[in-house]
Every structure is written in C-alpha cells, then in structure tokens.
A protein has these predicted regions:
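Proline-threonine-serine-rich low-complexity tracts
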Residues: 1-219
C-alpha cells in the first residue's frame, strides 16, 4: 500500500498593523511553511494563488488554498487558511480654531496663551504618526498687534499618509494714539498770582493723549 497521506494545514493567523512590511513578509513566509503534506505517491503540494503575497503592513488579508495531489488515493487533499494584518488605527486629527487676544496685555501673557493654543491641535492613529508645524518654531504675535498662522501636518506610514490644517492666532491692533497739544497762550501782566496760577493749571490740561498701550503722559 502507498504511504498514508499526512496533511497538516496552516491555521488562521493575525498580525498587528504598523509593523514594517519586511516583518509582515517574514511572518507570512514562515506561516506558509506550516502547511505540510507527505505520503501518497508522487505527491505534490501547490498553492492558490500560485505565488501568495503577504497583506499590506497597514492592514488586509490573504487567503491561501493548499492542494496536495498524489497518484495514489487520496488523489487530492486541500485546505485553506487566512493570514490577516489588522487595520491601522484611524487617524483622529483635531485642529486648533482661530483665536484672538486683546492688545495691551504683557508679552508674557500673549506668549503663554499662544503656547496653550498650539497644543489644542492634536493627532493620533495611523502608523508611526508624526505631527509637525510650519513654521517649525511658531512665534507668538507682538503684544501690540499682529497675527501668526500655523499649519500642522500629521504624517503616517499608513493612509491617510498626510493630514493638514491651518489656524491663525491674532492680537488685535493697539488703539491709535490721539495726542492733542496745548497751544501757546499769553496772559497780561499785573493779574494776581492766583489768577495766573489758575490759568496756567487750566492750560496744562488742554494737552491730552489717549490710545496705545499703557500710555503715560508726562511733562
């Protein structure tokens, strides 16, 4: 009697996403070899597809059917198994919203608000994700007014490979300076000193200034 056919089929296997493709390929190649067949007469073990390919490292599956043929019964023995790579985590991208701060705060306060605002853009998921900004080192606007637009880019080795967004941080313009200067004034002599003093005091107050930030009028 011909040797009995001994057919050992691979079992379904699952690998995690975000490994290198080389690691997935190596695991898949080793998995293929776990299907073995011996016995019968002139036995031949083939696969369908003829040249099985590993799934993508970002997720997918490959089902392989092995067929062992023998010129002695059983003439054909088959089995199938599936090698799966789990799907990569979905990219979750939360972008900062435009923000406006009032002028005339301290620069330290503006810088702190800007730094906190930068952190409101977050990204996770995909594979080997990296979040970068343009400009590389964003700087807060001047406390007296201005704006900074930042573009964030999240890259992943699995789709979506690039996700971007932009937002603007603005400091309102400081109020315009309005400066009204006293005009030359002449008083007649021979008034009382009290009258001159009163007129002088009134004249001093005709110079006024408003606007800017933390303005101070001195003489």
């Amino acid at each position: 009697a011909s040797p009995a056919v001994v057919f050992t089929c691979a079992t379904n296997k699952t690998e995690a996403a975000c490994q290198t493709q080389a690691a997935i390929d190596a695991s898949f190649a080793a998995w293929l070899l776990t299907t073995t067949a011996t016995g019968g007469c002139n036995g031949s073990l083939t696969t369908s597809p003829t040249t099985p390919m590993a799934p993508n490292a970002c997720g997918g599956s490959t089902t392989v059917t092995w067929t062992y043929t023998s010129s002695c019964a059983p003439l054909t023995t088959t089995c199938s198994a599936t090698f799966t790579v789990t799907a990569s985590p979905a990219v979750v991208f939360t972008c900062a919203t435009n923000k406006t701060e009032a002028a005339c705060q301290t620069q330290a306060a503006i810088d702190a608000s800007f730094a906190a605002w930068l952190l409101t853009t977050t990204a996770s998921g995909g594979c080997n994700g990296a979040l970068t900004t343009s400009p590389t080192t964003p700087m807060a606007p001047d406390k007296c007014g201005g704006s900074t637009t930042v573009t964030w880019t999240y890259t992943s080795s699995c789709a979506p490979t690039t996700t971007t967004c932009s937002a603007t941080f603005t400091v309102t313009a400081s109020p315009a300076v309005v400066f009204t200067c006293a005009t030359d004034k002449t008083e007649a002599a021979c008034q009382t000193q009290a009258a001159i003093d009163a007129s002088f005091a009134t004249w001093l107050t005709t110079t006024t200034a408003t606007g800017g930030c933390n303005g101070s009028l001195t003489t």
